[in-house]
């Protein structure tokens, strides 16, 4: 009804809150249940169903476990799999720790691809620069970026040239800021101002002399002054355009 292009089942999150609900990475313990979920999700054959998973559970690598998991879920007929190429450790490590403490193993993704060449496997995990993303994209079906974009939204400004040999004239305009504030305005007062504005905070990444703007923003966030915050962001964009073209 909402006309989505794709529905993704995420069985890669290791948080305790998620585990209490019996979903997330702990579902990898029951590959048949995951397969049944994917079956049920494909009621509308016009919408692609995919899955995002880890390569295993616990501290030790186990390719047999990973392979058997993929074997089972592919029986559902899905052909798009996003893989965070780390194990998920369900106890003793925070979700943040689970994003960097378990070692990466890209070889598992390459190996399963050789078994299922007709399935699209998208690599995720540890891709902390666009240069690394470009290199890995040539070795795999594709790459998925997460924290890199959150930490530095402007990392994508040159993606068309790097990946597709196309020129672009990328710029964040005042309209972008206005549209975003219009989007979050109805939620102001009922949701955390830090949560609402966090997607914008990293537009300062790597921009010279941005410290004064950050100080003003954090001050106004403490005062919950929504309108002044919008003006600060707009002034920043107007003054710093030269640095984010």
Give the role of each language-model region.
Residues 1-49, 55-62, 209:
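Active-site beta->alpha loop and helix N-cap motifs at the rims of alpha/beta catalytic domains
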């Amino acid at each position: 009804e909402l006309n989505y292009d794709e529905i993704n089942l995420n069985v890669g999150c290791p948080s305790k809150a998620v585990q209490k609900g019996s979903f997330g990475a702990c579902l990898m313990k029951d590959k048949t249940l995951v397969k049944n979920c994917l079956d049920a999700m494909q009621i509308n054959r016009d919408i692609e169903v995919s899955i995002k998973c880890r390569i295993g559970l616990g501290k030790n690598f186990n390719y047999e476990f990973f392979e058997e998991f993929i074997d089972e879920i592919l029986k559902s007929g899905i052909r798009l799999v996003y893989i965070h190429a780390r194990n998920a450790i369900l106890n003793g490590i925070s979700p943040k720790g689970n994003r960097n403490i378990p070692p990466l193993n890209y070889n598992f993704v390459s190996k399963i691809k050789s078994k299922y060449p007709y399935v699209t496997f998208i690599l995720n995990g540890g891709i902390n620069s666009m240069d690394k993303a470009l290199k890995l994209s040539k070795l795999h079906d594709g790459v998925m970026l997460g924290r890199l974009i959150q930490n530095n939204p402007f990392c994508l400004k040159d993606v068309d040239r790097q990946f597709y040999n196309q020129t672009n004239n990328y710029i964040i305009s005042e309209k972008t800021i206005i549209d975003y504030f219009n989007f979050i305005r109805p939620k102001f007062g009922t949701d955390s101002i830090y949560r609402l504005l966090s997607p914008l905070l990293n537009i300062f990444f790597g921009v010279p002399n941005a410290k004064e703007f950050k100080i003003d923003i954090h001050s106004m966030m403490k005062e919950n002054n929504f309108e002044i915050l919008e003006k600060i962001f707009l002034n920043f964009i107007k003054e710093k355009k030269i640095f984010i073209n």
